[in-house]
Amino acid sequence: MRVLGLFERGNNLNFADTYIYTWNKQYSYHENAFLISNQVATTIIIYLSDTIVNEVDKAFTLLNSNGIPALVIRKDHIGIFTSSNFTYDWQHKIVYFHEYTYYKNNEFIVSDEFWLHTNIHELLPYKLLYYERGMRKLYDGEEYTLYNTATDDDILYKYIYEKDAIMSGDDYSELYDDKNFRNFVHFMRLLRMRFAVPFDQLSNRVTRSRAFFKSKIHIGLRNESIPQALDNINSQWINYSANGIMISELKGSGSYSEKRISEFDIGQFKNYMNFLTLMFYIKNMKKRPSCTIIGAAPGYWIPSMKRYFTIITYDDKIVDSTEHHNRYFSEEDITKVRTNGVYIDVRSDFDKSDWKKRRQLVEEETKRWLEISYRLLEGKYVEAVLLKMTAMDIEIPDGYFVHFPTTYRKSEYYLLIDKQIIKKQKVKVTKSLMYNAINTIYSDNVFISGKYTLRGKTEGVVALYCLSNTINQKDKVIQYANSFSGTCMTVRLNNTYEVNKVINLNNADYTFLPSDFVCPVNTVLTSYRGYAGVFGYAITKDLKSDGNNHIYIIPNARDENNFDTFASHLGLSRYSHSKRFSESATTMSGYLFRDMVSGKEDMGDTDKANYASGHVFNAIAHYRFDYTYDIVGWLRLHKNKQFRVKSDIYEEHTSDEVRNAIEAAYTYYLLDGDRVGKEYAKKIMEIWEAQV
């Protein structure tokens, strides 16, 4: 949903799903904002005049803080605003469109510069374009700044990690004869046009920046947080990602099995991932990372990293780094290293005509670099080393096995070790063991760290999309959330039809209901839209009950003087309106249903004097489709006489009106045979009665 103000009438009447809202001067801006937010159209247009613009501005402020984008636009921008999804930074007047119409121009857009130095352009019928962070400025004016952030990065990453599974599917096989990159890209673009843009992924790139900046302990970081981690590399923070495989954890046996992973060169991707893994590993030591790279060429990703890290390079080919030594690294250079990280990615160009001899030389070279790594770590400056290894029988430190995909899978992997690791017992590994690991395990996260334990102080903690994981006990997660005082945490919402459902997407997650928690009253429980509003953003995408929704738990977010500022009733009735105006026996079904359950006999004034609260009923009965409204917080504040709102339309509900609404929601679920909904209504009633 988006709300657009226009001083001039534009050519907008031909757009589907657009509603022209007439500002009612008889109502306050609160009432107008509420009526606007509950329109079922996705685009609401308001024609402005000097007589109403000040009141409209107040309504727009209220809508934006509730995560519903509302802004005055130029007439010549009506097209993109009505046809594109976007994330709006309403505090700074910046609009981030997530717009793929560049497909019309046969463009393929990436946000990592090193892709330009591959042969991708030879494999695709598209023009390959690079934009830093994927950001293309479309307009820069006094009213606002417009960017487009949509890219094809996700298609590249799916190709690298998931192409075998995707191209083995029946749908792909029916459409294409060949399993190649060109067809893969075409297929992924078809899926994008058929279903939806990856809105959450694109929007989160924008909105997670503020939550990251405010936090010092990050739980569950993954690669999508790389930009924020880089932007905050000089501030104090650590991460707990429960990620990383130790050498001693490897099992099984295998043999050499060369495989081409990609039609185009992804060696630079692998090197970039390796480098970031090392840098963020050192960052977790509470040190400012820096790096010496031995064997750096061509290093097409290094120039963009110089702004974040000091990077010293050694290679006989020229590399654009902070300081480049145009020669090979020698043993005499060991004592000259002053960076706290060293990345060794060297393999001499041995004669390939005699593979046995070459194999012997590769193993000897590997041992030599391992010894150099020990000497570097025994010195004063170096904290961690990431070095190239090969599958062989050898005794090595029990470090981390790092294996990001590269163009060809052969015999190589990487070993991450630090000062403490090399002091511990070494591990004997066999060639067979390492081949099995190389053939079956691929790294997919640059953040390596231990597991976070759900105890201790929570100040400064941000935990997005991870604490629901079944590695944590569900009751412990609830206890943790009830005392949580960090920036924000999330748990997966149960919008299935199975009580205590465990959802398996990328990981196994427990599911929760807002009624599971007993948080302080200044903590807001809301949806992604509500979370966006709290952190200064608004989003156009409507919530979908797709099994991948999270409850955002945000401490100290409540506006104690005005409940409506964040996670309020704005938009609460949209789903109800849609159902009543398209499916039910009468548009008054909501009023009639609640009064019938409440035992009201005279229905004459049911739409004006209902026995049950419509707000409370809608918040419970339709939570799957919009749980932005913090109903649990509202119930607690309301009953304790602590509820405050700056509104001329609010009327305090009686206990009977609230109780009747909860009972009506329970009956609604009962008639649907919905056990989860019944459980939710039952828990909500317990919360209310406990307050009584």
Curated annotation (Swiss-Prot):
It comes from the Viruses. Coiled coil: none annotated. Keywords: GTP-binding, Host-virus interaction, Methyltransferase, mRNA capping, mRNA processing, Multifunctional enzyme, Nucleotide-binding, Nucleotidyltransferase, RNA-binding, S-adenosyl-L-methionine, Transferase, Viral immunoevasion, Virion. Multifunctional enzyme involved in mRNA capping. Catalyzes the formation of the 5' cap structure on the viral plus-strand transcripts. Specifically binds to GTP and displays guanylyltransferase and methyltransferase activities. Has affinity for ssRNA but not for dsRNA. Capping activity is non-specific and caps RNAs that initiate with either a G or an A residue. Together with VP1 polymerase, forms a VP1-VP3 complex positioned near the channels situated at each of the five-fold vertices of the core. One of its GO terms (cellular component) is viral nucleocapsid. One of its GO terms (biological process) is viral process. This is Protein VP3.
